[in-house]
Curated annotation (Swiss-Prot):
Signal peptide: none annotated. Belongs to the Casparian strip membrane proteins (CASP) family. Keywords: Cell membrane, Membrane, Transmembrane, Transmembrane helix. Homodimer and heterodimers. It is a multi-pass membrane protein. Residues 1-29, 93-100, 173-230 are cytoplasmic. The chain crosses the membrane at residues 30-50, 72-92, 101-121, 152-172. PANTHER family: CASP-LIKE PROTEIN 2A1, CASP-LIKE PROTEIN 4A4. It is found in: Cell membrane. This is CASP-like protein 2A2. Its main location: membrane. Residues 1-23 are annotated as: Disordered.
Length: 230
């Protein structure tokens, strides 16, 4: 008789756990790096714009003279700080709770739109500075302040690169949040198809028939036998 090897299942379980831990560690490292890259991008865009000042025979022009560029500086500063803080939290090897998943999901979404708005309004100002708009008496300032417009363009392009990373972070945080919920359970009943909401357990099965129900069912099924004379 062949002896059953009882040592393999525990080893298989341990190997599966180690593999899951390796996968989680790799994903945690990848997300940490994904959050650190926007720090460098946002700081670069911020520094380039902060140093963006030009003075010539036509006068002096600084980023602080335009509200769109001031907003870009502030937005990049906020996003750099948030990215650094979130990277530190994500790098910690611990399980995520539902409140943490919701917090990162919402903050990633908000910061993505904040940095996207900064790049969008800066692009509009750069377009007007290059082309001008006679209807609002906006002259083509880049013809006289080419260096200023060049630095502003560099800062805006870097900001849009940061937007790409924030969009990826939004997808990651969305997956981490909604993967915590169970898939919807669909059951077939006599009244049709009934869909159970996310995360709720399936409906319990109907109770088995009692002895009384079985006895009545047997009597109804055999009326001739019940009416026969004794």
């Amino acid at each position: 008789m062949e002896k059953k090897d009882e040592g393999n299942p525990p080893m298989a379980v341990m190997g599966s756990r180690d593999e899951n831990e390796d996968v989680k560690s790799t994903m945690r490292t990848a997300e940490t790096m994904l959050r650190l890259v926007p720090v460098a991008l946002c700081v670069s865009a911020l520094v380039v714009m902060l140093k963006n000042t030009q003075t010539n025979d036509y006068g002096s022009l600084s980023y602080s003279d335009l509200g769109a560029f001031r907003y870009l500086v502030n937005a990049n500063g906020i996003c750099a700080g948030y990215s650094l803080l979130s990277a530190v939290i994500v790098a910690m090897p611990r399980a995520w709770t539902m409140p943490q998943a919701w917090t990162f999901f919402l903050l990633d979404q908000v910061l993505t739109y904040v940095i996207l708005a900064a790049g969008t309004v800066s692009t509009e100002v750069l377009y007007l500075a290059n082309k001008g708009d006679t209807s609002i008496a906006w002259s083509a300032a880049c013809a006289s302040f080419g260096g200023f417009c060049h630095k502003a363009l560099i800062s805006t392009v870097i900001t849009f690169v940061a937007v790409i990373f924030y969009a990826a972070l939004s997808l990651v945080s969305s997956y981490k949040l909604f993967s915590k919920y169970d898939a919807p359970v669909v059951t077939q009943s006599g009244e049709g198809i009934k869909t159970v909401t996310l995360g709720s357990p399936p409906p319990p099965p109907p109770p088995p028939p009692s002895n009384l129900h079985l006895h009545l069912h047997a009597k109804l099924a055999c009326p001739a036998h019940n009416n026969s004379p004794n």
